[in-house]
Amino acid sequence: MLEKIYLANPRGFCAGVKYAISYVEQVQANSEEQIYVRKEIVHNRRVVEDMKKNGIRFINDLDEAPNGATVIFSAHGVSPSVVEAAKQRGMKIGDATCPLVTRVHRKARKIKDTHQIIYIGHEGHDEAIGTMGEAEMFLVESLEDIISLKDKIDPNKPLTYLMQTTLSVADTKNIIDQISKTFPFVEHPSKDDICYATTERQEAVSLMMDKIDAMLVIGADNSSNSLRLLQLAQKSKPHSFKVSTADDLSKEYIQNNEIKILGLTAGASTPQVLVDEIISKLKIFYPNANVELFPGSRDDSMNFKLPGVLLS
């Protein structure tokens, strides 16, 4: 019988996601034209569906929008080739890329002519695709990938690394350690690229492990940071699980695994309305379960301001 639900804090929307959503809303509010968004604005189906209801059209490729259309790039960023293609077609361009992802792009442009670059990230992820479009890079996802680069890296040319902003802090440390062992001459950046929100949400989950039986992560299946939260929780609490919506909740799973104290967190692209719906359903299953903010939690205080000019 579930007795208590501890809420992790921070959880849910990060500053970059809020920035991207606000960006689209502001462009739409100031335009009478059809607004197109390339790819999912953030990796959450509920957010995308709500925008569709408000008239936003989502496309996977620029070819799906007419010449001269207003197109906004998602929070994950795009490669320079995509930007150039939009310009060639006379499109009005809005860039809702998270400022922390933009920072990684700037770093890539700065060093692309002087350094060999290893990119720590997930193949096929929208953010990785966009960043790797800035320069020639070697993608690594595992320790084995690093070993395979031995014959590809020139020891006589400077080497450094960049990383996807939504990675597991612990796993990335292991990869960086292996890079250092394999390539002792590597230049370490003064600061890693994992964003504050990813780090803080993982730290919040780690703090709860000794006080819970399992962690419930709310997030989309294609949300990298949500999957990292689940992996982190399962290392200590194997019965931890993830749902995308309240419909995914299973009372039987909680009962069968004898979960009495449940931690709850949400990925950085998960809206609060989903969190509220899932808590409500848990309370229907277990009316006597107490819902509490986990002691020692802290708020997410970062905020990004929208630029004065939204379209170029």
From Swiss-Prot:
EC id: 1.17.7.4
Domain of life: Bacteria
Entry binding sites for [4Fe-4S] cluster: C14, C98, C195
Binding site for (2E)-4-hydroxy-3-methylbut-2-enyl diphosphate: H43, H76, H125, T165, S223, S224, N225, S269
Cofactor note: Binds 1 [4Fe-4S] cluster per subunit.
Keywords: 4Fe-4S, Iron, Iron-sulfur, Isoprene biosynthesis, Metal-binding, Oxidoreductase
A GO molecular-function descriptor: 4-hydroxy-3-methylbut-2-enyl diphosphate reductase activity
Pathway assigned to this chain's UniProt record: Isoprenoid biosynthesis; dimethylallyl diphosphate biosynthesis; dimethylallyl diphosphate from (2E)-4-hydroxy-3-methylbutenyl diphosphate: step 1/1; Isoprenoid biosynthesis; isopentenyl diphosphate biosynthesis via DXP pathway; isopentenyl diphosphate from 1-deoxy-D-xylulose 5-phosphate: step 6/6
Residue numbers binding isopentenyl diphosphate: H43, H76, H125, S223, S224, N225, S269
GO BP, sorted A to Z: dimethylallyl diphosphate biosynthetic process; isopentenyl diphosphate biosynthetic process, methylerythritol 4-phosphate pathway; terpenoid biosynthetic process
Residues at the active site: E127
One GO CC term, this protein: cytosol
Cofactor(s) needed by this chain: [4Fe-4S] cluster
PANTHER family the UniProt entry points to: 4-HYDROXY-3-METHYLBUT-2-ENYL DIPHOSPHATE REDUCTASE (PTHR30426:SF0)
Similarity comment text for this entry: Belongs to the IspH family.
UniProt function note: Catalyzes the conversion of 1-hydroxy-2-methyl-2-(E)-butenyl 4-diphosphate (HMBPP) into a mixture of isopentenyl diphosphate (IPP) and dimethylallyl diphosphate (DMAPP). Acts in the terminal step of the DOXP/MEP pathway for isoprenoid precursor biosynthesis.
Name of this protein: 4-hydroxy-3-methylbut-2-enyl diphosphate reductase
